[in-house]
C-alpha cells in the first residue's frame, strides 16, 4: 500500500518540475499540530496552477504517482473544483484546484479574515514558486463560535421540532429508511445544540471542531454518554426509543443554553410538539 508520505514526495517533485504548477500546500490532519493524522487520515492538497481546469478534468498526471483505483471529479462545499482520489491499497488524497491568479489575492485574504478553520489549524507548504505561501499563519486554534442570538436560537429550535414531527410520521408509517433520512434533521440540530451548550457553559472557552469530530472530548461532561442512544436500528420500537432520547436530550441542553445566554425558551411550543410526536408514534393520530 502506498503511503501518504510517498504520494506527497512524488507530488512535490512533480509539481516542482512542472512550471504550470505555481504553489501547493497541505491542510487537514496531515498539517495539524492539534489532533494530527492517524494511520487512516487522508491527504488534502490545495494547488494553484496556470491551467487549473486541466488538472481537474484529467487524471493522467495522478496515475504517475502510484497505482490508481478511483479519481472522482467534483466540487468542495465551497464550490471549488476537486478530485477525490483513492490509490491502490486505500490511501485517499483530495486535490483542490485554484487558478494561479488567486495567489495575488492571498495576502489580502489572510490579512482581512476570518480564515477558514482548516487554514487556522495548520498548513504545510509543498511548493511556493511565487513566494506568497510564507504568509500562511502558523498552526493555531480557531476563534470560538459566536453564541446564538435570539433569532438564531429560535430558528434552530423550530428546525429541530419540525424535523421531529416529520420523522415521527415516517416512523408511524413503518417507512424505516425514510425515517432514518428524516432523523438527520434531528441529529444535525442536536449536534449544533451540543456545541452551543459546550460553549455557553464554558464561558466561550471552547473548540467544537466540525461535523462532530472529537465530540467525545469537547462535549460537556455526561453529554457524550447521553448521545449514545440517539441513533436507532431499522426497527419501529427502537425508532420510538431513539426519538424520545433525542427529544429529551435536546430539550435539556436547549433549556440550559437559554438560561446561560438569557434567551427566551418556547416551553409551550415544545410541549405541544412533544405531545403530537407521542400521539403519532403511538398510533393515536390517524394518517
Where in the sequence are the language-model features?
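Short amphipathic alpha-helical segments, especially helix-boundary/capping motifs
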Residues: 7-10, 57, 138-144, 227-228
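Generic secondary-structure boundary/loop-capping signal
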Residues: 37, 62, 122-124, 130, ...
Amino acid at each position: 500500500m502506498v503511503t501518504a508520505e510517498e504520494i506527497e514526495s512524488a507530488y512535490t517533485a512533480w509539481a516542482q518540475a512542472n512550471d504550470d504548477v505555481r504553489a501547493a500546500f497541505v491542510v487537514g490532519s496531515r498539517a495539524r499540530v492539534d489532533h494530527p493524522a492517524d494511520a487512516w487520515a487522508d491527504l488534502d492538497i490545495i494547488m494553484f496552477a496556470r491551467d487549473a481546469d486541466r488538472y481537474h478534468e484529467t487524471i493522467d498526471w495522478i496515475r504517475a504517482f502510484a497505482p490508481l483505483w478511483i479519481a472522482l471529479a467534483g466540487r468542495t462545499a465551497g464550490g471549488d473544483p476537486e478530485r477525490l482520489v483513492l490509490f491502490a491499497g486505500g490511501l485517499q488524497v483530495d486535490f483542490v484546484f485554484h487558478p494561479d491568479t488567486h495567489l495575488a489575492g492571498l495576502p489580502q485574504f489572510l490579512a482581512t479574515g476570518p480564515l477558514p478553520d482548516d487554514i487556522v489549524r495548520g498548513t504545510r507548504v509543498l511548493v511556493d514558486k511565487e513566494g506568497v505561501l510564507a504568509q500562511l499563519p502558523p498552526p493555531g486554534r480557531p476563534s470560538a463560535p459566536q453564541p446564538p442570538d435570539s433569532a438564531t436560537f429560535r430558528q434552530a429550535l423550530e428546525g429541530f421540532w419540525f424535523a421531529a414531527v416529520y420523522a415521527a410520521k415516517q416512523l408511524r408509517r413503518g417507512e424505516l429508511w425514510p425515517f432514518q433520512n428524516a432523523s438527520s434533521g434531528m441529529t444535525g440540530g442536536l449536534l449544533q445544540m451540543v456545541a452551543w451548550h459546550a460553549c455557553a457553559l464554558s464561558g466561550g472557552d471552547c473548540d467544537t471542531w466540525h461535523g462532530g469530530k472529537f465530540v467525545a472530548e469537547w462535549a460537556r461532561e455526561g453529554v457524550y454518554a447521553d448521545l449514545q442512544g440517539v441513533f436507532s436500528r431499522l426497527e419501529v420500537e427502537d425508532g420510538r426509543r431513539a426519538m424520545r432520547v433525542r427529544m429529551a436530550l435536546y430539550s435539556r441542553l436547549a433549556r440550559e443554553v437559554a438560561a446561560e445566554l438569557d434567551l427566551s425558551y418556547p416551553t409551550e411550543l415544545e410541549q405541544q410538539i412533544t405531545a403530537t410526536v407521542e400521539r403519532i408514534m403511538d398510533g393515536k393520530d390517524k394518517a
